Amino acid sequence: MYRKLAVISAFLAAARAQQVCTQQAETHPPLTWQKCTASGCTPQQGSVVLDANWRWTHDTKSTTNCYDGNTWSSTLCPDDATCAKNCCLDGANYSGTYGVTTSGDALTLQFVTASNVGSRLYLMANDSTYQEFTLSGNEFSFDVDVSQLPCGLNGALYFVSMDADGGQSKYPGNAAGAKYGTGYCDSQCPRDLKFINGQANVEGWEPSSNNANTGVGGHGSCCSEMDIWEANSISEALTPHPCETVGQTMCSGDSCGGTYSNDRYGGTCDPDGCDWNPYRLGNTSFYGPGSSFALDTTKKLTVVTQFATDGSISRYYVQNGVKFQQPNAQVGSYSGNTINTDYCAAEQTAFGGTSFTDKGGLAQINKAFQGGMVLVMSLWDDYAVNMLWLDSTYPTNATASTPGAKRGSCSTSSGVPAQVEAQSPNSKVIYSNIRFGPIGSTGGNTGSNPPGTSTTRAPPSSTGSSPTATQTHYGQCGGTGWTGPTRCASGYTCQVLNPFYSQCL
């Protein structure tokens, strides 16, 4: 993205690269979150910062753009080093240009604001440092409203192992640092970043053929990634992505792997990860818009994710005061509702693809959980595959019987960015009520441990039941390997959703 401003004045830092200018003052929107212990939660006064890739990048001595549309200035940016010396990042008009607003503990991201599309923000500990979270042995909870996110959009909340200062101390060329949203990395080793490691990414830059604002450069930025929440109103996924090197590293060309390279699996990170999407696992009535779903995405919900010290990952939800466990899944020899080594192996066997252990699996991503990770909150559309991997049938040539291909109910013709941007510009996501602490401390949206009196509507992990036992509404009542109740409570019937899962509806 770029902006044109009339005033001509700039803060010059000629001795360093990836500089800072002040045509627009940089004021981080405040955002309150809570740190929890067994005795309760304490408010923390944080803020959010916009990623550097969205910012106006211009000549340090004028308002001439260094990056315009999806191309670099050949005069200011003949190579990576010269470009970084000549160009600066400017402050952001968060609400007016990017559609980013905060109120108390809530962050709202608008999809389209004037010419801007989407956004990516980080939670700050102070004005120049990202807030870091050690996930191992802890849980992370937040409220989310995805009611305004149709097919093709992704309101993503996740953690990455990027440097807390945005790489400012590690790379002398980076004068902007975390204050201006630098240092991003993830498991796709993105090559669309304008600056990496304090230098520009202009060498080898190829403007996108289908996106007027982006391109692919000669370098990428890799690090471990934990996708807590990738979702719209139709589908949601929880996915760990390990990298051979936990922290941020720069890669070159197609050896980066990931979305931006011809060799997707040629890098040091796992671009696919080990995902848990209830719809993909056969539970097509757990999550979606309307009262026919266990979790109704027309309403706000609370998402609680727990990280055991062995690297396994558990999840439950709270909506309208009712607790919903992650639904059980039967995948090959695996039966349960936790991402662990057995599940990841069974998923790969059942659905195909590369082995989750190729880049170290849960043992490797657990190293990231044991260190500091930065919280990312974003909203985006997908110019690569139209978000079909999240909410539709993918690959699109798969048949109805292809294991793991059906990920959501969206049409395979949906999600085309040009159409989504034109038809749903007012889409938005709201993240709020962020809480973090030891397992059992965040209490969902109640401020206490999950209430024992709440109804758990997802399948229980029962090992048996008496012949007279009945299952509640939305509970599992049959399927391959199921040994729990097969009778439903009065008013409901046991309906077969697939060979592995029947549900009381």
Swiss-Prot record:
Biased composition (Polar residues): 409-423
Keyword Transmembrane helix carried by entry: no
Region forming the signal peptide: 1-17
Keyword Cell cycle: no
GO biological process assignments: cellulose catabolic process
Group of enzyme by EC: hydrolase
Temperature-related behavior of activity: Optimum temperature is 50 degrees Celsius.
Processing after translation: O-glycosylated. O-glycosylation of the cellulase linker provides protection from proteolysis. Linker glycans also contribute to binding affinity of cellobiohydrolases to cellulose.
Known EC number: 3.2.1.91
Residue numbers spanned by region Catalytic: 18-449
Region feature Disordered, mapped onto this chain: 399-423, 440-472
Keywords of the record: Carbohydrate metabolism, Cellulose degradation, Disulfide bond, Glycoprotein, Glycosidase, Hydrolase, Polysaccharide degradation, Pyrrolidone carboxylic acid, Secreted, Signal
Coiled coil region boundaries: none
Reaction equations catalysed: Hydrolysis of (1->4)-beta-D-glucosidic linkages in cellulose and cellotetraose, releasing cellobiose from the non-reducing ends of the chains
Chief subcellular location: secreted
Pfam family name, one: Glyco_hydro_7
Residues found modified as Pyrrolidone carboxylic acid: Q18
UniProt-listed InterPro entries: CBD_sf (IPR035971), Cellulose-bd_dom_fun (IPR000254), ConA-like_dom_sf (IPR013320), Glyco_hydro_7 (IPR001722), Glyco_hydro_7_sf (IPR037019)
UniProt comment concerning the protein's domains: The enzyme consists of two functional domains, a catalytic core joined to a carbohydrate-binding domain (CBM) by a serine-, threonine-, and proline-rich, highly glycosylated linker sequence.
Protein name: Exoglucanase 1
UniProt source species: Trichoderma harzianum
